[in-house]
From Swiss-Prot:
Pathway per the UniProt entry: Cell wall biogenesis; peptidoglycan biosynthesis
Species per Swiss-Prot/TrEMBL record: Burkholderia multivorans (strain ATCC 17616 / 249)
Protein name: Biosynthetic peptidoglycan transglycosylase
TM ranges: 19-39
Keywords: Cell inner membrane, Cell membrane, Cell shape, Cell wall biogenesis/degradation, Glycosyltransferase, Membrane, Peptidoglycan synthesis, Transferase, Transmembrane, Transmembrane helix
Length: 245
C-alpha cells in the first residue's frame, strides 16, 4: 500500500505483511534455539556438561545469600555410582527407562487428566529422559509451552545419546536439595560417603527425594520418606538397568 501526500510518497506496510515478518523472525529464532540444543546434546556424547539451567539459576540465588554459598556438584563416571542408586531411581522414577523411547504415553495422559481436573498444571508424567531435558535447558516453570519444548529435547536426547549416557548425565546433574546436584554431591552431603558406596536403603531414601528435593532436604527423616523408601527398596531388584550395565 502506498499513501500519497502532495509530492511525497510514503510506503505503508500492511498489517498482514508485518505479521508475516514477525512470524518469519519468530520461526528463525525458534529454529536457531532447536539447533543450539541439538548441537549441545551431540557434543555431550563425548564431553560432560559443565552445568545445567537449574544449576545456573541456583548459583545466582546462592551467590546472593548471606553469607554467599556455592553449588555442590562433582562429576563422577557412570561406573563410580552405586548400582543400588541406579536401581532405586529407575524403580522410583521410570520403571521402563531401559526400553522406552523417552516417553510414557500412559503417564502423560494421566497427567493431562489430572491437570484438567485441577485447572492448572500439577503433574507432568515425566520419564527420566524428560526430567533430564528440563534440568539441562529449561526452567522450573510449569506451562504447556515448556512441556512442548521438553518433549522436543527428549527426542534429541534419545536420538543422539544411548541410554547409559543419558542416565550418566542424569545421575550427575539431578537436584538433591538446595544447591546439591548429582549423585556424588548428594552422597557426601547426606551420608558423608562417595556415591560408589551407597547402600540399598540409602539409595532408596535418595530416590524418594527426587520429585521434591528441597522439601525433603528441609524435612529429613519424615515418616513419608521412610515409607516410600521401603516400597522402592522392594522394587529395586526388578529394576532393569541400561543394557551395557
Amino acid at each position: 500500500m502506498v499513501a500519497v501526500t502532495g509530492t511525497q510518497r510514503t510506503r505503508v506496510v500492511s498489517p498482514t505483511r508485518w505479521i508475516v515478518y514477525a512470524g518469519a523472525v519468530f520461526a528463525a529464532a525458534w529454529l536457531a534455539t532447536q539447533l543450539f540444543y541439538f548441537v549441545q546434546i551431540a557434543m555431550w556424547s563425548f564431553v560432560n556438561p559443565g552445568s545445567t539451567a537449574f544449576m545456573r539459576t541456583d548459583a545466582w540465588w546462592l551467590s546472593h545469600d548471606t553469607p554467599p554459598a556455592q553449588i555442590q556438584h562433582q562429576w563422577v563416571p557412570y561406573d563410580k555410582i552405586s548400582r543400588n542408586l541406579k536401581r532405586a531411581i529407575i524403580a522410583s522414577e521410570d520403571a521402563t527407562f531401559a526400553t522406552n523411547n523417552g516417553y510414557d504415553v500412559d503417564a502423560i495422559l494421566q497427567a493431562w487428566e489430572k491437570n484438567k481436573a485441577r485447572g492448572r498444571i500439577v503433574a507432568g508424567g515425566s520419564t527420566i529422559t524428560q526430567q533430564l531435558a528440563r534440568n539441562l535447558f529449561l526452567s522450573r516453570e510449569k506451562s504447556y509451552i515448556r512441556k512442548g519444548q521438553e518433549l522436543i529435547i527428549t527426542w534429541m536426547l534419545e536420538t543422539l545419546l544411548d541410554k547409559e549416557r543419558i542416565f550418566e548425565i542424569y545421575l550427575n546433574s539431578v537436584e538433591w536439595g538446595r544447591g546439591v546436584y548429582g549423585a556424588e554431591a548428594a552422597a557426601r552431603y547426606y551420608y558423608r560417603i562417595p556415591a560408589s558406596r551407597l547402600g540399598a536403603w540409602q539409595s532408596a531414601r535418595l530416590a524418594v527425594m527426587l520429585p521434591k528435593p528441597r522439601w525433603f532436604d528441609a524435612h529429613r527423616g519424615s515418616a513419608y520418606q521412610a515409607q516410600r523408601a521401603a516400597i522402592i527398596a522392594r522394587r529395586m531388584g526388578a529394576a532393569e538397568l541400561p543394557q551395557s550395565e
